[in-house]
Structure formats: structure tokens, C-alpha cells
Swiss-Prot record:
Name of the protein: Flagellar FliJ protein
Organism: Bacillus subtilis (strain 168)
Gene3D superfamilies from the UniProt entry: 1.10.287.1700
Compartment list: Cell membrane
InterPro entries the UniProt entry points to: Flag_assembly_chemotaxis_eff, Flagell_FliJ
Keyword annotations from UniProtKB, A to Z: Bacterial flagellum biogenesis, Bacterial flagellum protein export, Cell membrane, Chemotaxis, Membrane, Protein transport, Transport
Amino acid sequence: MAYQFRFQKLLELKENEKDQSLSEYQQSVSEFENVAEKLYENMSKKELLEQNKEKKLKSGMSVQEMRHYQQFVSNLDNTIYHYQKLVIMKRNQMNQKQEILTEKNIEVKKFEKMREKQFKMFALEDKAAEMKEMDDISIKQFMIQGH
């Protein structure tokens, strides 16, 4: 008699859900990394711009150039603020996806444990049935020999 886990279809469904959650988590990690990279790039641009402004101030800078730099820094600050908000949002999404993935992993592990226990019970029952059958055969052989 072959072993058949009674919740196999449910286990497969849970595994599919886990795989889907893993895919969504990986996607959210990728999105978070992309947004964080954009934030870093913009912060680096601002730092470079500030350094260039300092150099130009020492060597002399027109009022027009100063306004231009100030406008550019202001725009960069707005962009940086936007990306900071996005980073926070993407981090929260990533954390939510990670929690969901953890829950799905736990569900799958429960079913795998259940399958393992059920298989052990099946193996024990099968072994007991086999031993009983062997005992029956031994008794029949003993009886046939005329004892």
C-alpha cells in the first residue's frame, strides 16, 4: 500500500502561495534598492554641487551664478525629499512582504511536519500489519506441519 498524504493538495497550494510571496518580496527588495540608489545619487549630486559652489565662491562668483546654484540646490532638495519619502514607503512595503513570506513559510512547514508525522504513523502501521501477516503465515505453517 502506497503512502498518500491526505492534505497533499493543500500543501501544494500553500507552497505555491509561498513561492508567490517570495517573488513579491524579491520584487519589493529590488524596488527598494532602486529607490535608495536614486536617493544616494541625488545626495551625491548635491554634495558635489555644494563643493563646486564653495570653490567658485573662493575664486569669485557672479550673483546670477549664485542664484542658479541656489535654484539647482533647491530643486535637488525637493528631489531628495521625494526620494526619502519613497525609500520609507518602499521599506515599509518590503517589510510587509517579508512578514507575509515568513507567515507562508510557517504554514508550509506546518504541513510538512504534519506529512512527516503522518508518514511515520503510516510506516509504523504498515510494519505492524506486515508483522501480523508474518505471524499468521508462521502459525499456518506450524499448523500445516501437524503440531
